[in-house]
Regions:
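Conserved beta-strand hairpin/beta-sheet module of binuclear metal-dependent hydrolase folds
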Residues: 1-50, 152-163
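Short acidic-hydrophobic surface loop/beta-edge motif
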Residues: 4, 22, 128-134
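A structural signal for the main folded, soluble domain(s) of proteins
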Residues: 5, 20-21, 39-41, 48, ...
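Divalent metal-coordination and catalytic microenvironments
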Residues: 9, 22, 33, 61, ...
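Metallo-beta-lactamase
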Residues: 37, 130, 137-144, 148-222
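Active-site HxH/HxHxD metal-binding segment of metal-dependent hydrolases
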Residues: 41, 45-130
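Short amphipathic alpha-helical interface segments
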Residues: 224-234
Length: 234
């Protein structure tokens, strides 16, 4: 798993998705998501190869490709995990997870997703604004839609990690956009237009500069509306 600098102390790990992290110093970092369960060894080794250990996890949302290793790092390194209350509730137990994996029987949920069950140490407030976490000051933007408690996270370097609120340009034609709430997703994407950041990082492998953001939002909105129209026409 390669790592790539974005700006200042903000970097990304390049796995199946991009996992941003913020370096507190030369040895400690805050992970913004933890990727898939199957990426655990590669993710951990990439950090170790660069002399880094996680000091905390600030999670955009609790889907399998974003919070898949939260509990592992929380328990192994004795570090805090921060989630919104809505996402924390989903991870509170197997029955709660069944609401996410609605079509799967309970036994399959346990086999496929038991690793997602954990209790966060910090509940991210249900509002936009600053969040002090593990000695760093982040800006939180509530961006529900893709999931109930999805957030975008801006690092002190003016890098905004939008998680799954936006698809990168390379994914616009390769991925079916999913939203728990289509309308909330539309509103959250529009909200991103006003974010005062220099770079925007998308979980599904992409980044854009401030001046490129508006066009990318337009294309995301058009894709969502087009797919919704196709479904409606069935």
């Amino acid at each position: 798993m390669d790592i790539r600098p974005i700006k200042g102390n903000t970097w990304v790990l390049e796995g199946m998705e991009w996992i941003p992290f913020y370096k507190l110093d030369e040895r400690r970092c805050i992970l913004l998501d933890t990727g898939l369960l199957g990426e655990r060894e590669e993710l951990e080794q990439a950090l170790l190869d660069h002399g880094l250990t996680p000091a905390g996890i600030l999670c955009s949302h609790a889907h399998v490709d974003h919070g898949g290793n939260n509990r592992y790092f929380q328990e192994k390194y004795q570090i805090p995990v921060a989630l919104t209350a809505k996402e924390a509730g989903m991870c509170a137990g197997l029955l709660n997870l069944k609401c996410y994996f609605l079509m799967l029987p309970p036994g399959m949920v346990e086999r496929e997703a038991a690793h997602l069950v954990h209790t966060p140490d910090v509940i991210v407030p249900d509002r936009d604004g600053p969040l002090s976490f593990c000695g760093a000051e982040f800006q939180i933007l509530q961006t529900p839609g893709h999931s109930a408690g999805h957030i975008a996270i801006q690092t002190p370097d003016r890098v905004c990690y939008v998680g799954d609120a936006l698809l990168s340009r390379e994914q616009l034609w390769a991925k079916l956009p999913y939203c728990l709430s289509h309308q909330a997703g539309i509103e959250s994407r529009e909200k991103l237009r006003d974010v005062d950041a220099d770079f925007f990082v998308m979980a599904h492998r992409g980044m854009c500069r401030r001046e490129e953001l508006s066009a990318l939002i337009d294309d995301n909105q058009a894709l969502a509306q087009r797919r919704a129209g196709e479904v409606l026409a069935l």
